[in-house]
């Protein structure tokens, strides 16, 4: 028992001393800090505090250049400026949002790719309400009629009437062509229709009186409006010479 009491007295005595010393040192340090704060701190007047700006002034020269972070975007981009703060400075980084594209309607898909509209008919039949399905079917029928229908063809028209109509159109075209050809072969003075344009030209020389074809025999000054007549006249000269030789 005596030994245990002595050990307890020995262990407790230094702890008490150390705690008293620590308390005294802490009191001295707190007094010194309060004295220094009273000496060094100078509070400004209330008027200057009331008129001072709320936000602190930031030195622009100390700030680094603004860093812009751009997110990957699709065709439609919207800018959403966000302030991001760092330990050293404030960086303004406009982040570009990437909204999800809206699904194309049936008309837009059909105008872009008609094959896609036929392939996705089963999907649209399940995901579209009945009223919209009716509108889509009507639009699909209209587009198919525009692409594959013949011009000037009415629904319910008899094919025989169509053939007769086309035949009459062809007959009218042929008549017009004949009239044009007839005008090319018809004399504008007497109205005679020639078989060929060349004969029309020779016939026209009769009305004008021109004789462009002259005889090539020496000392013969005859001229003709038709080349065949000139050649016939030239043969007469040759026959006369042949008769003289035989005599």
Swiss-Prot record:
GO MF annotation: an example: zinc ion binding
Pfam families registered for this protein in UniProt: zf-C2H2 (PF00096)
Zinc finger spans (C2H2-type) are: 185-207, 213-237
Q: Name one GO biological process term.
A: DNA damage checkpoint signaling
DNA damage among keywords = no
Keyword vocabulary terms for this entry: Metal-binding, Repeat, Zinc, Zinc-finger
Q: What is this protein called?
A: Zinc finger protein YPR015C
**To which species is this protein native?**
Saccharomyces cerevisiae (strain ATCC 204508 / S288c) (Baker's yeast)
């Amino acid at each position: 028992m005596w030994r245990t009491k002595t050990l307890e007295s020995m262990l407790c005595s230094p702890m008490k001393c150390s705690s008293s010393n620590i308390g005294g040192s802490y009191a001295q340090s707190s007094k010194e800090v309060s004295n220094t704060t009273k000496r060094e701190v100078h509070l400004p007047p209330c008027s200057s505090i009331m008129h001072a700006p709320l936000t602190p002034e930031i030195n622009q020269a100390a700030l680094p250049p603004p860093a812009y972070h751009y997110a990957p975007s699709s065709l439609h981009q919207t800018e959403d400026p966000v302030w991001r703060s760092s330990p050293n400075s404030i960086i303004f980084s406009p982040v570009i949002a990437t909204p999800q594209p809206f699904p194309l309607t049936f008309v837009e898909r059909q105008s872009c790719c008609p094959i896609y509209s036929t392939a996705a008919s089963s999907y649209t039949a399940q995901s579209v309400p009945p009223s919209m399905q009716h509108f889509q079917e009507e639009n699909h029928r209209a587009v198919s009629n525009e692409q594959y229908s013949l011009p000037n063809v009415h629904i319910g028209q008899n094919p025989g009437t169509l053939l007769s109509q086309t035949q009459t159109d062809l007959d009218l075209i042929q008549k017009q062509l004949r009239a044009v050809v007839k005008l090319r072969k018809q004399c504008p003075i007497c109205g005679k229709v020639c078989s060929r344009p060349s004969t029309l030209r020779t016939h026209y020389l009769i009305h004008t009186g021109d004789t462009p074809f002259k005889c090539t025999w020496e000392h013969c000054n005859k001229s003709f409006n038709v080349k065949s007549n000139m050649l016939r006249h030239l043969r007469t000269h040759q026959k006369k010479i042949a008769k003289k030789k035989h005599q």
